[in-house]
């Protein structure tokens, strides 16, 4: 079975007075095949400028999964639909697939990307916390570690394993207490039980 349809999503300027913003329009092709169930293909490049002035680009023709969070979170907490933060999802997975940026910096811009996309702050902080806890991490392709140890591999990426009960409590805490991002980072760091298989890229 093969299903494709195309949608164009307008990307607005800064939201809520933030300097971070998406540029242009996102044109994506929805895929439903045996190989790529619930995936999208980016037809045109997507650009995002963060609050520090750096521009992040997701190149055209990348095939991207239509989710940012695992079922452990999506099915147990009433978070916004992925379609409400589609551009942020494209941004993050584009960096994962590209494998050239630092995963720490990529995760750090998720919150401001969500805000730039129009997400309410409490939802943005909850999604940000989940990405910090269980989101993809990777060794950059151009790093010395990759060149010395993993040159024969097309990529090296992994997900950390959080204590999901504590993560769900943390999402509830964010909704009630509205903590700062540093407070969220500290709490999330404490609930990760396994950072991953890679000795250098934790």
Question: Where in this protein do the model-derived segments appear?
Answer:
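Extended terminal accessory/targeting regions
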Residues: 17-202
């Amino acid at each position: 079975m093969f299903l494709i349809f195309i949608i164009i999503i307008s990307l607005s300027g800064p939201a809520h007075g933030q300097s971070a913003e998406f540029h242009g329009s996102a044109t994506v092709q929805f895929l439903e095949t045996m190989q790529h169930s619930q995936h999208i293909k980016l037809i045109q490049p997507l650009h995002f400028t963060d609050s520090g002035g750096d521009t992040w680009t997701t190149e055209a023709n990348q095939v991207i999964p239509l989710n940012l969070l695992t079922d452990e979170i999506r099915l147990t907490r009433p978070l916004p639909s992925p379609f409400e933060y589609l551009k942020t999802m494209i941004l993050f997975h584009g960096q994962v697939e590209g494998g050239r940026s630092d995963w720490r910096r990529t995760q750090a811009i998720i919150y401001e990307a969500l805000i730039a996309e129009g997400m309410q702050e409490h939802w943005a902080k909850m999604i940000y916390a989940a990405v910090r806890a269980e989101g993809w991490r990777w060794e950059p392709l151009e790093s010395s570690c990759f060149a010395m140890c993993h040159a024969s591999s097309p990529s090296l990426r992994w997900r950390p394993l959080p204590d999901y009960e504590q993560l769900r409590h943390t999402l509830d805490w964010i909704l009630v207490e509205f903590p700062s991002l540093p407070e969220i980072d500290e709490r999330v760091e404490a609930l990760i039980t396994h950072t991953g298989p890679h000795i250098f890229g934790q």
